[in-house]
Structure formats: C-alpha cells, structure tokens
C-alpha cells in the first residue's frame, strides 16, 4: 500500500481484502462465531484486539474464546511474530512487531501454531516519522469507560452504563475515523476496600451481593495461577474485552491508568489510605494491563528510567504509566498516570514522581511539535472535593460550615446538608500541599510556551471546557490554559459527582476560570482535529431522556477552536 494513502483511504481499500478472506477461507466454513458491529469482518476465535503503534513498531494485545495450547502467530510484512502468553491458560496473548516503516499501511493476520487463520486479516497503519510534517491528525478521546454491567449502586441504582450504550457511543466516535484513540483511565471499576468498607450501608450491601456472585480475591495468593486469575477474568472481561471486542483493531490505542485501574477508589480515611497502591492492588493493575491493553511504546525523548518503564516482565522499553503520542512535527501528547506513584511527603509530595515531572517540564519547554497537549489522569481546573486532587477544596454545606474546624474526609455519599459548595476553610484529610505546588510548576511551564497551552484530562465524570486565567499566584492571562474534559463513556446514575458527592464539578477556590461554567454530567466523548494552524475539539454528550437511538446520529454540543497564533 503506497505511503501517499491517508489512513482513511488505506482502511477503505483494505476492507475488501478482509471481507473476501472471511468469506473464502476454509477456516471459517460454517462458522457462527462473532463478527464485528457491521457484520463485515469475521472475528473467528478472537474476543478482543487492542493495538498500539508509533512510527516503527506495533504492540498488539489479544484474547481468544478458549485457551490455545500452542503460541499463535501474527503475520505482518512477510514476517511471523510468535505470540507471548500473558495468562496461565493461553487465552491472552501479545505480539510485539518492531522494525516497521513509518506512515505505512500493513495487513495483519492471526494464525494458530499450525498456520490456520484465527480471524479475518485486517489493516493497521503506522504513524509518520517524528521529523515528518503531516497536515492533519484526528483523535477520539474519553475517560471512565469501565464498569461491570451487572454491578449496582446503593438501592440497586445503575452504577455503569450498559454495554449497548457504550458500544453505541464508541461506534459513533469511530464513525469519524480517528487516527488514534485515547482512553484516559478507569478501564476497570472493581474497588475492594472502598466499596466493602464504605460508611454507606447501601454501598456495602451492593458490593457484598456482587462479590458473592463473582468471588473475592485472596490477597495472600498471587494473581496468576490461582483462583484469583479466574475471578480477575470474570470481572474484567466484560469491562474491556467485551466492551471493545475487535472494534479498534485498525485504530492505534493509548490506554492510560488511573485509580480504579488499581482496584480502589482514591480515598483517605483514618482506617485506610488507598494510594499509592499496595502490593496486591499493584499486581492486579499490572496484570490487567499485561493481559488486556498495550503499554506505551518508547519515545526517543522519554527516558527509560522513568518509573514504571522498561520492566523485565514487559515488552522491551515500554512504559506502563507515562506515554507519548507523537505524530510527526504536528502533535505531541504527554500522558501521565496520577495514581501509581503518588507520594505523601507533605510539601515535598507529588501526584506524579519527580522524574516524570521533569520529563513533562522538559518536553513542554523543548518540544519542537507544532501542538503540545498535556493529558493527566487527574484533571486540572475542577474539583469534586475528592481526596486525590491537585486542590485542597472540600465539599461542605451550611451545616458543616458551622461545625468546629478540623480535617474533613471526602467519601462517596459522605456529604449531607443544604447549599453544598467547595471550601478551603477546613482541611482535607491527608491532602498534601506538595500536590498543588507541583500543579503550579506545571501550569507555569505551560503558560510560558509560545504555542497555546492545552490540557485534556480524565477521571472526572463530566464533559466541558474552560480557560484558566490564574492559579494561586501564577498569572496565566497572557497565555491562558485551555482545560478540556473529554467525556465519560461508562458512568451510570450512581457515578455522577452530583449524585455521589452532592455537588457537580466546580471551580476550586485557588483558581480563576474565564467562563466558570460547570461541566455537563452526561456520557460522551471528544473528536479532536489537529492541523498546523489550530486544534478543534468537538464535545459529544448523551443522557436520558434523550432516546437511545439518538446516539447513532449524535452531533457535538460544543466546539472549541484553539488557534496557533
């Protein structure tokens, strides 16, 4: 396939090949196995495919309907790449393909150890070289896609959207044929202590009932090779493998991790502090990543010494927590996990470790990309009064304002009273002043750029945007920081901030935002178009009482244009 083809042209031209192979190959004779959403591609034995790509390498994560005794193969560019098993039973495999040409379309094919096709072939295209000058790239971005569809909140309330709703939202986003997908954290919701030890009896009962059906992890045993592995697949398959299936097989993905991906909510109480994650939670998070979705591929400007990078039990040189999406000289996206390496060192604390902060600051000041986007898993610009935020604000009511001063713990369903609002008049239990100090160093570097300062965040169950004009004593008015919440795919009724905490996401006390408009608590996603002269971000939202059928023709409710000059 010639390099001059765009990714969209390549996918269109490759479609006929995939359809023909599915119909003609004896491997699928009489098959009633799953096809993709449009019914024109035969998934065969494959349950899910999630590929990462840069300009020279592909890393593919895959799962199959049943365990494979012999290692499967990935056929690409005349090569046979032997799969590396990610689990005990041979259902999960990964394929690492280095040495590819930049900006080139490839046809991929999975086969078993004897060479028999396991699914139809499909196309995938590498990114342009870092020194290339592409004129356009399109991203599909969202957060909080996880959640077991059978889980329930207090009183049987819907906790997460059905897979049908999430599938419809994904299909609508993919209809725009993005060049890459960024899923910003919270791919899994299966909290342990924070559900089972909640101060709310209804949450404890809902969690207990659910875990009685699935089983509880034995924290004294390894994750793999014990019954923990069965429980893990039971809990996670619906949230990742069944959610994505093979929809993204031809679209490079970037999956960031956040708090729930370590099987806890970010909470601090007198009887427990959930982050940084303990050893077992960390093992759960790393195992899910290893089995289900790709790590970040290496980038020449990102040190292999960053925490969570170049581990001996991972593909060479990948990073588990800090990633780069580089699309020629047009775009650089810096993605960072704000959970795994959080520290509790008072004024010296950080939500990300010092090495990662240095990387962010260096790239912000030195990147030659036309556009630079920061993408943390914990948002700048708004607060829900949660513990692990950059800001010290807590949710209080008129009644708590009259209570004696002291530290307040902010838990799900934990704030009662009238006229709820954010306040810094009372301390937030275990909140670290070093977190905001780190925030200030990042916003200072971002506003100091000659290009627009842009940040797109995850975690917060809402959609919206604003511009930061001031942060504490940092004046950003000469180059305001664009803040965008890209939308939440899976949040159900129990998860909206106004339901869980009594207050919609609001502006922290220490910030001055230009619009000061509360984000919208609806499901959705963003389509982001980047050209040399501007970034255009289209925000899509949906929620009842709008009919389900409206998702298939959803149009943006807001369009943000960020010009380069």
Spell out what each predicted region is.
Residues 2-3, 9-31, 103:
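N-terminal export signals
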Residues 35-565:
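Metal-dependent phosphoester/phosphodiester hydrolase catalytic core
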